[in-house]
Amino acid sequence: MGVSSGHSGSVSIEQLVAAPAEKVAAYVSDFRNAKEWMVGVESVEPLGEDSYRLTLESPIGKIAPGVRMVEHGPESISWVYTSSIEGGGRVEVSPDDGGGCLVSYTGEFHLKRKLFDRAARLVGAERFARTNGERSLSRLKYLMEARHY
């Protein structure tokens, strides 16, 4: 698993998965599955076409940002937060030579209220997001390799 982070509130993680890229991409691209594999996502409420409300556990308590899908392709999805959080995320699934795939997650986030953003930085929101991202891709790997999709 590869991990890197840039400026505050930014995470980039990769995970090799021994499952067909098209199966992994189809599972990930259905955002309703987020609560099954994204650690910290407690619920996903569909609001309309390509719009959802998530309930997330965070270092400062539960938050419920709106999410809008901005890209929904065969090998990648990306989204932006529409409330509570600024930023978004992207998951890309690339086939490898052995019949598996490489899953890449990048995310950038800042709480919209500066006071909460400062508090989140003080309690380690970036480390929390990185750890949850690593655990999420490990969970996705397990689900896909165990064929639980």
Model-derived features with residue positions:
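Hydrophobic ligand-binding cavity/cleft-lining segments
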Residues: 1-49
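Short, surface-exposed coil-to-beta transition loops
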Residues: 10-12, 62-66, 86-90
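Short Gly/Pro-enriched turn/cap motifs at secondary-structure boundaries
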Residues: 5-6, 80-84
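Short, hydrophobic/aromatic-rich segments at coil-to-beta transitions
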Residues: 46-53, 71-80
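Beta-strand elements of well-folded, non-transmembrane domains
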Residues: 17-19, 58-60, 71, 85-87, ...
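Generic structural detector for well-ordered beta-strands
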Residues: 14-18, 45, 55, 68, ...
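Beta-strand/loop substructures that line and gate deep hydrophobic ligand-binding cavities in soluble
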Residues: 83-135, 140-142
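Hydrophobic-ligand-binding modules of eukaryotic lipid transfer/binding families
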Residues: 1-16, 22, 100, 128, ...
